[in-house]
């Protein structure tokens, strides 16, 4: 995590103090369950809560102990014993470090997912608002970067809305998959600990018991979680890239909001660059980069090793913090996006009507021309216009072979922009419902 791309709401989840608070809660809830089962005295379990529930753990002290013990959980338990006193000997009874570490990580990941779902909701809200504003604003659709046929700018935003709706569903599913708890002891057999302890801790921490753990929670769950973040990041970049292309000087159909006093270049005072979209492109690359180590973490030796640990200490905070920042930036970008319908119309007109070529092709075939002949007739009139030599509709009306099939009025009819937009309402209802 670097502060430049970190929001405090997400950062707090990954702070050391938060981690130690979660560790304490796991240990204390486990002690409660062990007390109910008669394994440890009930007074000892109560004392753990009473003496440490509201404590601010001394992170520096824990780090000091870890430098000697070379073990983070033992360092924490040692510091906890300094706070709790004699009753601390009943803490971590019959548990192993992975019980604490893995359960804590999943608590943090579920909390992060909750924030990310809220972030996606902000993006969806902004997209829906702007989509309805420009539901019928005509613009050119492009394939391979080349003018194809008319769409509306509202449809472009509706595409993104549908994509982020899917992203939200995937994230909710990934959150559910990662929300498991393991308090199963060494090698996961419950040999030293009653499974009811795990069930109690799971309920207390708003998790579900891991059906079968091998001392660690299986990392395919985490791989799915981070893969989901990677897909969401790809969606962020797809929309950011669309904005970057549409802000090109020679296109200028949209533009990022440019605030009073903002500067675009240290050398060229006229510049207004799509810096937010470019920033999002870079952030998305980083989130996707964390997917690979998450996948590789699935492969652990036998019942456990800690090859996953060092990677997760980096990818868990970095991926969630970065995506959180990116989604919030994207929501603001869409909300303030400057949209230029007049430039959209001007760009549509640049090719002299060629964007209606498919309608002419279909009209000719419906009047009796073979598809091959119809294609040749449309193509031979389109290519001069592509080179800037005339107007498509005019050339078609001057072509004797075309006139065998279509009258001037029928040719003109094929250039109706509204024809391309007749099902926009239907598409919007599919995407947004009846609202």
Task: Give the label of every model feature segment.
Residues 336-405, 418-421, 426-435:
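C-terminal alpha-helical interaction appendages
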Residues 286-369, 377:
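Long, amphipathic alpha-helical stalk/connector segments used for oligomerization, subunit docking
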Residues 110-121, 128, 158-161, 165, ...:
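Short amphipathic alpha-helical segments with heptad-repeat character
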Residues 38, 280, 323, 374:
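Residue-level signal for inorganic ion chemistry
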Residues 132-154, 253-257, 261-271, 302-311, ...:
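Glycine-rich cofactor-pocket loops
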Residues 1-184, 190, 194-200, 209, ...:
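A helix-coil-helix interface module used to build multimeric assemblies
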Residues 189, 202, 209-216, 345, ...:
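A structural signal for small-residue-enriched, beta-sheet-centric alpha/beta enzyme cores
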Residues 198-291:
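Acidic, glycine-rich loop-and-beta core segments that form the ion-binding/anion-interacting portion
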């Amino acid at each position: 995590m670097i502060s430049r791309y970190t929001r405090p709401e997400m950062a707090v989840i990954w702070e050391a103090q938060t981690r130690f608070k979660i560790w304490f809660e796991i240990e204390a809830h486990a002690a409660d369950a062990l007390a109910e089962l008669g394994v440890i005295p009930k007074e000892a379990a109560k004392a753990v809560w009473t003496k440490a529930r509201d404590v601010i753990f001394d992170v520096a002290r824990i780090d000091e102990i870890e430098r000697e013990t070379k073990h983070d959980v033992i360092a924490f338990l040692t510091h906890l014993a300094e706070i709790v006193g004699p009753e601390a000997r009943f803490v971590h009874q019959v548990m192993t470090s992975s019980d604490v570490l893995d359960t804590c990580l999943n608590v943090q990941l579920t909390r992060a997912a909750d924030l990310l779902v809220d972030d996606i909701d902000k993006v969806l809200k902004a997209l829906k608002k702007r989509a309805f504003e420009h539901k019928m604003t005509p613009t050119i659709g492009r394939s391979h970067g080349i003018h194809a046929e008319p769409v509306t700018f509202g449809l472009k935003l509706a595409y993104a809305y549908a994509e982020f709706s899917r992203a939200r569903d995937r994230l909710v599913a990934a959150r559910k998959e990662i929300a498991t708890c393991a308090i199963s002891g060494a090698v996961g057999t419950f040999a030293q600990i009653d499974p009811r302890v795990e069930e109690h801790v799971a309920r207390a921490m708003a998790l579900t018991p891991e059906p079968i753990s091998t001392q660690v929670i299986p990392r395919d769950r985490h791989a799915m979680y981070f893969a989901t973040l990677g897909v969401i990041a790809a969606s962020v970049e797809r929309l950011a890239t669309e904005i970057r292309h549409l802000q090109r000087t020679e296109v200028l159909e949209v533009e990022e909001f440019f605030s009073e006093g903002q500067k675009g270049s240290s050398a060229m005072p006229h510049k207004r660059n799509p810096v937010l979209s470019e920033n999002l492109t870079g952030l998305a690359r980083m989130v996707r980069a964390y997917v690979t180590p998450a996948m590789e973490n699935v492969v652990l030796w036998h019942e456990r090793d800690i090859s996953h640990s060092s990677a997760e200490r980096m990818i868990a905070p970095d991926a969630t913090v970065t995506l959180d920042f990116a989604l919030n930036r994207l929501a603001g970008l869409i909300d303030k996006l400057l949209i230029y319908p007049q430039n959209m119309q001007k760009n549509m007109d640049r090719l002299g009507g060629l964007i209606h070529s498919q309608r002419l092709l279909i009209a000719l075939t419906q009047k009796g021309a073979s598809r091959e002949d119809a294609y040749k007739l449309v193509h031979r009139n389109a290519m001069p216009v592509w080179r800037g030599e005339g107007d498509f509709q005019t050339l078609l009306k001057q072509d004797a072979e075309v006139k065998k099939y279509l009258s001037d009025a029928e040719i003109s009819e094929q250039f109706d922009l509204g024809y391309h937009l007749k099902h926009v309402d239907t598409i919007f209802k599919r995407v947004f419902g009846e609202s």
